[in-house]
Amino acid sequence: MEAKQESSTVWSTASNNDTGNTPQVHFEAGAVAQIVYSGDQSDRTQQQVVYAADGSSYTSVESAEHTLVYIHPADGTQSQLAVTNAALPTLTEASSSPLGATDSTVDSEDEEEDNDSEDSEMDDWEPRALQPFTPQNLWCEDCNNANPAACIKHGPLHPILNRPVMSKARASLPLVLYIDRFLGGVFTKRRIPKRTQFGPLEGPLVRQSELLDTHIHLKLYMLDPEKEGERAQDLWFDLSDEERCNWMMFVRPAQNHLEQNLVAYQYGSDIFYTSIKNIQPKQELKVWYAASYAEFVNQKVHDVTEEERKVLREQEKNWPCYECNRRFMSSEQLQQHLNMHDDKLNLIQRPKSRGRGRGRKRFGGARRPGRRTKFLCPQTPVESADKTQELLASVDKLQFEERTDGALNGLKVVEMAAESMETETEDALDPPPIHTESLQDEEDSVTPPPVTEIPESAKDDLSHTSPIDPHLTPQDMRRARRIRNAALKHLFIRKSFRPFKCPQCGKAFRDKEKLEQHMRFHGRDGCRHVCHQCGKGFLSSTSLEDHLVLHSDQRNYSCLFCAESYDRLELLKVHVGIHMVNGCFLCPSCKKSFTDFIQVKKHVRSFHSEKVFQCSECDKAFCRPDKLRLHMLRHSDRKDFLCSTCGKQFKRKDKLREHMQRMHNPEREAKKADRIHRTKALKQKEPTTDFESFMFKCRLCMMGFRRRGMLVNHLSKRHPEMRLEEVPELTLPIIKPNRDYYCQYCDKVYKSASKRKAHILKNHPGAELPPSIRKLRPAGPGEPDPMLSTHTQLTGTIATAPVCCPHCAKQYSSKTKMVQHIRKKHPEYQYNSSSNIQAPLAATVISSTPAVITTDGTTAEAVVTTDLLTQAMTELSQTLTTDYRTAQGDFQRIQYIPVSQAGGGLSQPQHIQLQVVQVAPASSPHSQHSTVDVSQLHDPHSYSQHSIQVQHIQVAEPTAAVQANAQVSGQPLSPSSQQAAQELSTAQLTPVTLAQQTLQTSSNQTQGATQHAYLPSNWNYRSYPSEIQMMALPHTQYVIAEASTPVTAAVNSSQVKTTHYVISDGQTELDGKQVSVPSTATQGHPDPLEQPAGGQQATTQYIITTTTNGAGASEVHITKP
């Protein structure tokens, strides 16, 4: 035990000289056991040790005093192993046996091979001498040593940086505020009302001499704990350290009273900020001292100038009246002012009468005829009554134009000392307490005072504003306001207070007469229609029939969980309590749990009820009529709900509400404001000079593009005359990723994010939705991959043919996207767009292993470096073009009608039987079936040979006399043909509609027959369908093979020729060329003078010439013009 306790010390203090005392024993599978001896056992010989495969213990031959320390490969921690005394074989025998013999499982052959390779690496490794500890050296656990830099053998480490942590000041910022990154200061996200308190302030306390002028200076009033009642040393808040202060350090001081919206003051032992006005969103917080606190810190409050007072008054009045252009501070004041406009309108419109005024009054003395007076006002002196009328007439003007002065924040207010003064007028205006019981006996004897007619002068005064009576004192104004508030309170109590309640049905009334009138409905007196079951009386038969439904067998309220039904909803709510399981209701259909009966009732009605309400416009059905009405709005064009912020219109009110919550919420507006102040870092785009490195290229402008849409936009703007089918990159399929979307709450898997979202909303209500892939931001250094939170997995790619818009140059990967584009960009064609949708372009894939024919006629293996995009996209498009391939050995028959000579008629039609041949570039032996070879990116694009595969055709030709008259202009003529060429239209020619094919004369053909490949002078290869357009060949070269009419050779000619042309991209027309070979020409070495050179570019075409002698032997030559 002592040896084991000292093992860690011996291990850590081992030096270079102690390596002999710590032998390492190598076992199979790369396991290493190291024996650490104690101090007095260092001279012992090596012990025979077997390291167990499970890593829990080891076995020694004898009870030696040593400790075996196991180093965990995962984290490098050390642990001691228990000792088991047992006699074991020698090391050689132990090492020859597999270590994993204790396990029940047997390793496979592949795992044994991997273990052998690991053993070989461990055998080659030799530990270095342990270097002394130096903090400048980097430790390598694999080498068990330190290095001055990265380990040379094992390479550099893979660092994972710490996640950045915000400072205390920024982390403590409330959610309703944000700090501007560029301007500085604290701004609001939403409206903050007046009298909102922030704080307390946190920060270190220092002396005044250590303060900085960049922040507001705040002093803390403190008492000395040792000396009672005496102040301690003055200490100030240091607001310069973000790690020790909270967010209030970022609030900047106000320069004047106009921009100040916070006051700083000390309450207790803390400093707080309080808002002195309503702070609007996106407004900065500016603080200054309160009046008393400013005197404490030897500062002055900001004086309010007359201009600032006007601005403040206009800012506070945010409720304008559209009748008289006045503004008010609150909606209540505006509503009271609008009532005054209503009174004026009623007084002006109604005619005069000698009786009492019938105009609408809010709080007048006029009463409805036959209505008794409830509350009486005691008699007041005449002077007080006149003054009261004056107050009531001018109270509206006072309430909205009152100006307050005072000592608070420098504002001048009227002295409030007069508030405590009690005058006789105040006593007269304050009525004594009145008891309702004492007034009921006097109600009959009291008559209301007469109301005189309002003179015309008074009506004229009501139509316009007039200044306040200067004789009214502030006390009179306050008393008038109290009278009006008391009247409003009385009106509210009168409307809401219902003390008289019916004992039978529980209905409440404000008056006793109403209750007595209601009680007659419960008895037989005064009611002709009486219920024979409960005795309740009704005034009409309709009301009785509605009541009898409650006593019928058809119960209206049935239980969802059993067969019980009730005539009242209250009884049903009491009953459903017995169906609760652990405080929750379980849906009888899907076993979902709900805490409220209303929720489970809505769930059953929405998802498990029968859909009987069918839509007349479509096939959808609903279980409720209100849902059907909402759905019918989809088929209408009316949009009655308008967003007042952005002007967008909606058909449904709930959609408008969702729009307001999603697009115009305060947090989003605050983010927009923050985004406006941000300046995007301008990245200087350096145009690349490697044109071939781009996937999508415009060869007319020699410009490359990274994306397909950029090339389409470029062609539509710069080259509108060019068709998209003429660009080979735009005919290639579109590669889209294919993903699986997993539900993180169950085992469901979906192919689209929208279906997964609908599943979560329906089956997991209230659960959090996974983030959208489109809104993910790249992870920073040390942060986890954001794709892990989306619960998606990439399962492969899908190659789809592009779908072109019939009205513009746009291309889309699916028909649905294209239809959406038409509805948005071409609404005039959305109803007939289905018939004009272009079918996806078909891409032909060629796969073959042909021979390569060189210029000397021999067949050799060619190493062709193909274009990276062409080869990769060709392999990807193989899955799409199976239907367009023609099986090997299939024959197609075409009919060719030649044109006779001048004055001659049409010759007999000739049928040419052509065998389809698949031609592809020869595969490189170094590619190893690899689609992308990095070495091809910088190879020069110079090609001198390509693959040509030759097959046979059979020609059924008529008599020689008819053939002699057949002549076609624009095609290569035979050496014996000396007649003038005649133009042949493309409508009369029937070209072979298969690309990348060459023809060769059959070896058993009639001697003297001549084979031609014709290309008319007006032939344009871009106008043909996509099947015969440019195919994938090296250097974007394309073979155009055509069948020709056999022409009888001359008598002295023993050789015939067949010519094929290879044209490159960008060459719109290819004129026919006459290739003549003298009869004495040597086979295999054609004269260069035979090649046509008239007006042809050197890099636009290749000419393939096949020479056949009289014996049937043929030879092929590839030359450049």
From Swiss-Prot:
User: Cross-referenced InterPro entries, in alphabetical order?
Assistant: C2H2-ZF_domain-containing (IPR050636), PRDM10_PR/SET (IPR044403), SET_dom (IPR001214), SET_dom_sf (IPR046341), Znf_C2H2_sf (IPR036236), Znf_C2H2_type (IPR013087)
Biased composition, Acidic residues: where in the chain? 106-124
Q: Name one GO cellular component term.
A: chromatin
Record-level Gene Ontology MF annotations:
DNA binding; DNA-binding transcription factor activity; methyltransferase activity; zinc ion binding
Q: Where are the transmembrane segments?
A: none
Q: Determine if Zinc-finger is one of this entry's keywords.
A: yes
What ranges of residues constitute the C2H2-type zinc fingers? 319-341, 500-522, 529-551, 557-579, 585-608, 613-635, 641-664, 696-719, 741-764, 803-826
One Gene Ontology term of the biological-process aspect is:
positive regulation of transcription by RNA polymerase II
Relate the protein's function as given in its record: Transcriptional activator, essential for early embryonic development and survival of embryonic stem cells (ESCs). Supports cell growth and survival during early development by transcriptionally activating the expression of the translation initiation factor EIF3B, to sustain global translation. Activates the transcription of FLNC.
Per its record, how is this protein called by name? PR domain zinc finger protein 10
This protein's gene is called: prdm10
